[in-house]
Swiss-Prot record:
Protein known as: V-set and immunoglobulin domain-containing protein 10
Gene this chain is encoded by: vsig10
Membrane topology: Single-pass type I membrane protein
Keyword Membrane: yes
SS bond list: C144-C194, C238-C288, C330-C387
Stretches in topological domain Cytoplasmic: 431-527
Glycan-carrying positions: 32, 41, 52, 64, 74, 90, 129, 139, 191, 206, 226, 260, 276, 325, 346, 375
Biased segments, Acidic residues type: 514-527
Main location: membrane
Length: 527
């Protein structure tokens, strides 16, 4: 029961609001459009007022306003042409046959735009086709603006070629949006769309700018020269990879630009051209210039090459024993473009290159070439071998002489030398012993423990001086009496030195007595 009464109450309130207040709703129109306001389906003549009767838009006695933009249709509906923003407001209508107490109210809203939508990205540089670009690592400011009434809702969206749209900051009810990006990366390249939406009309307008994010090449510019087309032409190759977009490359010869040729080897980051060998000279210089849009306009990168003949080095002579292997080497330096190395046998066939096979092995490491001759033969292999280096400028050659010898009996030679050495030692030893046999006696190892007795015999005075050394296991021997007669002048003419071995039984006292007696005799002789 209460629910039923409550519903009846709401219906009554709505009826009173419609009849008493007379609110007819909201009308919306765009600038410069024509809109018709209906006065609650009234068919008789009505008057129109704006903003709480403060201004008469269309009186009962008139069909049109003074400016002609307001008119009455069907006696009750108000027609507004060339709608303007200032026309927005609250309108009321009333029957001319009644007083103003019974009025119907209408709210008119006017929208404009959006228009003049602009997406701005700065600082950037512009290509001839109008596309803007920047470099990796730059700081950019993004702006989005629009004219609209009421103020629009603004948004910036990034659309990459290989990803879903990425929204950026947005703002509602404002005519300008701005944000900054610091240290821009390569993945921020794409189309930036500034979207402006009129919140009243829902009308949407976009402005799109394509932004390219360039990056310089990651490597330095490099130049090459080669003989890939043969020795009649020289290829010049200039490469500067890793950048976006592709660099601009140009070859120069002695300050003059070389016309670019179309080659299959030409790529976006490599420029290849060729020159005839007849136009080349030793130590001629070439330069490749590279320019990239990510760098400053005057910041160009260059590389130079100087062409030259090869320089050869090798051992002039080599030796090989019959049946063994030998390796000849040849080094090349200074050749630009690089030289091709071949080996020739200038005795058997000087015009034919040596080919690898059962007899020869050829290998090359960088600028070194090796020729290995297997199973050397004096008849076949001895002689000159030629190392030839050739590039587009010319040919250089160097000769190596190979001598093939028979192997020697090394063991027999060593044995002969050893026997000769032993013979010389034996001869020297025999000669020494023959000239002075006492050397052997003194050096006799069996007498190392003996003590010798030295006896001095005075032939003139028949006096003996004996010096004894203590010893063990020595046999005693008497003085030999055969003494020559004294000299006529009374002087001592000769001494004899004799060694004796005292017997083991001789005591030390005997040696002391002999020493004392000898001393006394010497004193008497001095007196």
């Amino acid at each position: 029961m209460w629910t039923r009464r409550w519903i009846q109450f709401l219906v009554l309130c709505l009826h009173l609001w419609v009849t008493v207040e007379g609110y007819l709703g909201v009308f919306r129109g765009d600038v410069n459009e024509t809109i018709t306001l209906s006065c609650n389906n009234v068919t008789e003549l009505t008057a129109w007022f704006k903003d709480n009767n403060s201004g008469v838009v269309l009186a009962c006695d008139g069909e049109n306003s003074s400016d002609g933009r307001f008119s009455r249709i069907n006696g009750s509906s108000l027609v507004i042409t060339m709608l303007q923003i200032q026309d927005e407001g609250n309108y009321s209508c009333s029957k001319c046959s009644e007083d103003k107490s019974s009025q119907a109210y209408i709210q008119l809203k006017v929208s404009s735009g959006p228009y003049n939508v602009l997406a701005d990205i700065s600082p950037t540089r512009t290509l001839p086709n109008g596309t803007i670009y920047t470099s990796v690592g730059s700081n950019l400011s993004f702006g989005c603006s629009s004219n609209s009434y009421p103020a629009p809702d603004l948004e910036i969206v990034l659309q990459r070629t290989d990803a879903n749209p990425e929204p950026f900051p947005s703002i509602k009810g404002n005519n300008f949006l701005q944000f900054n990006l610091i240290n821009v990366a390569s993945n921020y390249q794409g189309n930036y769309t500034c979207s402006a939406v009129n919140p009243l009309s829902g009308r949407k307008l976009n402005s799109t700018r394509q932004l390219l994010v360039y990056r310089p090449p990651i490597t330095s510019i490099k130049c090459y020269a080669n003989n890939s087309l043969g020795f009649s032409k020289m290829l010049l190759s200039c490469s500067w990879p890793g950048g976006y977009p592709d660099p601009l490359l140009q070859w120069e010869q002695d300050g003059k630009i070389i016309a670019n040729e179309s080659f299959a080897a030409n790529t976006k980051d490599t420029l290849v051209t060729y020159l005839n060998s007849s136009s080349l000279r030793v130590r001629q210089q070439f330069q490749c210039s590279g320019k990239h849009l990510s760098t400053k306009e005057n910041n160009m990168k260059t590389c130079q090459i100087q062409i030259d003949l090869p320089l050869l080095e090798s051992q002039p002579m080599r030796t090989c024993f019959t049946g063994e292997n030998v390796t000849l080497s040849c080094s090349v330096s200074g050749a630009v473009p690089s030289a091709t190395i071949t080996w020739l046998r200038n005795i058997s066939d000087p015009e034919s290159d040596i080919q690898p096979g059962k007899k020869y092995l050829i290998s090359q490491k960088d600028s070194l070439s090796y020729l290995t001759i297997l199973n050397c033969s004096h008849e076949e292999d001895e002689g000159y071998y030629t190392c030839k280096a050739e590039n587009v400028l010319g040919i250089k050659e160097i000769n190596v002489w190979l001598t093939v010898n028979k192997p020697h009996n090394i063991v027999g030679l060593v044995t002969a030398l050893l026997l000769l050495f032993l013979l010389v030692v034996a001869i020297i030893t025999g000669t020494v012993l023959y000239c002075d046999p006492q050397i052997y006696l003194k050096a006799n190892p069996f007498r190392s423990g003996a003590t010798d007795v030295l006896v001095l015999v005075d032939s003139e005075d028949e006096e003996n001086e004996e010096v004894f050394d203590t010893a063990e296991s020595v046999q005693y021997t008497d003085i030999v009496p055969n003494v020559p007669p004294p000299a006529a002048n009374g002087h001592l003419s000769k001494h004899e030195v004799m060694f004796h071995r005292p017997p083991e039984s001789t005591s030390s006292d005997l040696f002391s007595e002999v020493s004392d007696d000898t001393g006394e005799e010497n004193q008497n002789e001095e007196i």
